[in-house]
Amino acid sequence: MAAELEGSKALGGLLSGLAQEAFHGHHGITEELLRSQLYPEVSLEEFRPFLAKMRGILKSIASADMDFNQLEAFLTAQTKKQGGITSDQAAVISKFWKNHKTKIRESLMNQSRWDSGLRGLSWRVDGKSQSRHSAQIHTPVAIMELEIGKSGQESEFLCLEFDEVKVSQLLKKLSEVEESISTLMQPA
């Protein structure tokens, strides 16, 4: 079993398959597909623990967004651990991470974003022409139109109307947001 799992080409393919499934959303990549294509001589019972170990290592590396010094320390620890990986496997994992780190990181960033984004904002100030109360007619109102959409799809528009009090509340909240961002951006 150990000899069959040592091949660097097969391990590189396995890591690519795991990355495609875990980080790039290709859900058709199953453990049976990986085993039959890359390790056909290994039984499913022997392959499962190896697959789980490699999946865990890859997820640990990606979730920590390891730089190459951290990666080297992590892989060295894995080679010294009982039931860990071999130094040849560590070399393949290191090479794989060096070649795929940027794409995996971008994919994780895209997965963590809110789907829709603000594409545009327009506003104007009008005089209110209709109201239940006659005293509110001809009072100024701010009308804001937000264009919201996902990339590659048609936008949706949201129209908001604010009186003077609501504009003041909105500006106060935006000032609080700006202050929080400024606080977080200051060097420690």
Swiss-Prot record:
Transmembrane segments: none
Coiled coil feature spans: none
GO MF term set: copper ion binding
Compartment(s): Nucleus; Cytoplasm; Endosome membrane; Cytoplasmic vesicle
Binding locations of Cu cation: H100, M109, H133
Post-translational modification: Ubiquitinated; undergoes both 'Lys-63'- and 'Lys-48'-linked polyubiquitination. Ubiquitinated by XIAP, leading to its proteasomal degradation.
Residue intervals of the COMM domain: 117-185
Residues in the signal sequence: none
Any single GO BP term: positive regulation of protein ubiquitination
Pfam family, one: COMMD1_N
Highest taxon above the source species: Eukaryota
UniProt region (Required for binding to PtdIns(4,5)P2), positions on chain: 124-188
Sufficient for interaction with SLC12A2, as annotated region: 1-122
Keywords linked to the UniProt accession: Copper, Cytoplasm, Cytoplasmic vesicle, Endosome, Membrane, Metal-binding, Nucleus, Protein transport, Transcription, Transcription regulation, Transport, Ubl conjugation, Ubl conjugation pathway
Keyword Cell membrane: no
Gene Ontology CC entries for this record: Cul2-RING ubiquitin ligase complex; cytoplasm; early endosome; endosome; endosome membrane; nucleus; recycling endosome
Function: Scaffold protein in the commander complex that is essential for endosomal recycling of transmembrane cargos; the commander complex is composed of the CCC subcomplex and the retriever subcomplex. Can modulate activity of cullin-RING E3 ubiquitin ligase (CRL) complexes by displacing CAND1; in vitro promotes CRL E3 activity and dissociates CAND1 from CUL1 and CUL2. Promotes ubiquitination of NF-kappa-B subunit RELA and its subsequent proteasomal degradation. Down-regulates NF-kappa-B activity. Involved in the regulation of membrane expression and ubiquitination of SLC12A2.
Assembly behavior: Component of the commander complex consisting of the CCC subcomplex and the retriever subcomplex. Component of the CCC (COMMD/CCDC22/CCDC93) subcomplex consisting of COMMD1, COMMD2, COMMD3, COMMD4, COMMD5, COMMD6, COMMD7, COMMD8, COMMD9, COMMD10, CCDC22 and CCDC93; within the complex forms a heterodimer with COMMD6. Interacts with VPS35L; the interaction associates the CCC complex with the retriever complex. Identified in a complex with an E3 ubiquitin ligase complex composed of TCEB1/elongin C, CUL2, SOCS1 and RBX1; in the complex interacts directly with SOCS1 and CUL2.
Medical condition linked: Defects in COMMD1 are the cause of copper toxicosis (CT) in Bedlington terriers, a genetic disease occurring with a high prevalence worldwide and is unique to this breed. In Bedlington terriers the biliary excretion of copper is impaired.
PANTHER family tied to this protein: COMM DOMAIN-CONTAINING PROTEIN 1 (PTHR21199:SF1)
Family (UniProt): Belongs to the COMM domain-containing protein 1 family.
Protein name, as recorded: COMM domain-containing protein 1
Source organism of the structure: Canis lupus familiaris (Dog)
Gene: COMMD1
